[in-house]
Amino acid sequence: MSIELHKIYKRKKSDRDIFQELMPFKIKEILLIANYYDAYTIEREGQFTDKIVGEYLQVNLYTAPRFTSVASEAEALKILSERHIDLIILMAGLDKQTPLVISRHLKDLYPNICQLMLVNNNSDLAYFHTIEDRLYESIERLFVWNGSTKIFLVMAKYIEDKMNLDRDTHLGDIRVILLVENSIRYYSRYLPLLYTEVMTQTQELIFSEPQDNDMSIVMKIRVRPKVILATNYEEAVYVIDHYRENLIGVISDVRYKRNGEEDEEAGIELIRYVKRTGAYIPCMLQSQEIENAVKAEELHAAFINKNSPTLAHDIQDFIKGYLGFGDFIFRNKNGEPIDRATSIEEFKQKLLSIPDESTTPFATVFLPG
């Protein structure tokens, strides 16, 4: 009897119910551990909290997490004993040893709280590469300060997406974008671009459709695609295998670890792996080596130069053109555009008049118009 009632409940669950249950893990409280000098590097250009709130409001996220800043392990332990903390961020600058010691101590005492580390600049990364094994015993991921407080929004969203991925894809059929990049410097640069563009495009889709009173815009924004970061071949394959039905795009570097060894063609092999699944998943290779553009073309994948001055625009073009955020382009059997729809309503109307050949799966793939 209870099984039947459960089935009835599931069948009658409305969109609003599903939206409300998405993103059950939200980062509301962040503990920032930084000595006074390191804290100064991020606060010297203005009010830190105001800037964080501004970053959230810029992408229509109306509730920013609260930051509590401390300068020592003793202060951190006091805060942790007094209130619930969702995420710990440790800054490492001139003093690189103390944050590591604090991190290990906190991991022993609070193993379920995610810890991320933020280094002051790219030159500090060389040191952390030499101690990777010890570093990742307590630190989930390393990021590099790029001069913008947007990196804090990205760090919070990175953890939220990772924690909510399994539940949200099963409950709400949420889409997934996979970024494969092992360079801390580059993923610290890419992720802010990706999150900003995904959130902006999601909002444009929401605002382009008639709004109902039963569902707030804030709630609908929860259906934005998850952005998942992998740093080696095996991590990427795991995401592809487990979330293939939800995957709408793969952006991959060319060189990273495969089978534990640096592989100069790991990204090439990954795109081939995606193609072998038989699913239509748009792929983009990104590399500093321009000659890899030829390999990308052979794989029918897009390509961008990692050092391009138009990097942000190139990523925007890929997301709008290939991941379903841009206009829907109707094409004939030769792939030539014959019409376009800018909204769901317009799409429905155009379906009544376009040739049958333009409604085949081949002809209705999202491509740049």
Which residues fall in each region the model found?
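Conserved phosphotransfer microenvironments
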Residues: 6, 10-12, 41-44, 48-53, ...
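Non-catalytic signal-transmission and effector/linker regions of two-component phosphorelay proteins
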Residues: 1-68, 132-226, 233-234, 246, ...
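Alpha4 helix (beta4-alpha4-beta5 surface) of REC/receiver domains from two-component response regulators
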Residues: 96-101, 105, 117-143, 149-153, ...
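Residue-level signal for alpha-helical context at structural boundaries
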Residues: 94, 124, 173, 208, ...
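Hydrophobic beta-strand segments of well-ordered beta-sheets in folded domains
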Residues: 27-33, 85-90, 113-118, 139-142, ...
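Amphipathic alpha-helical segments that form the core helices of the histone-fold
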Residues: 364-369
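Structural motif
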Residues: 33-37, 90-94, 118-121, 146-147, ...
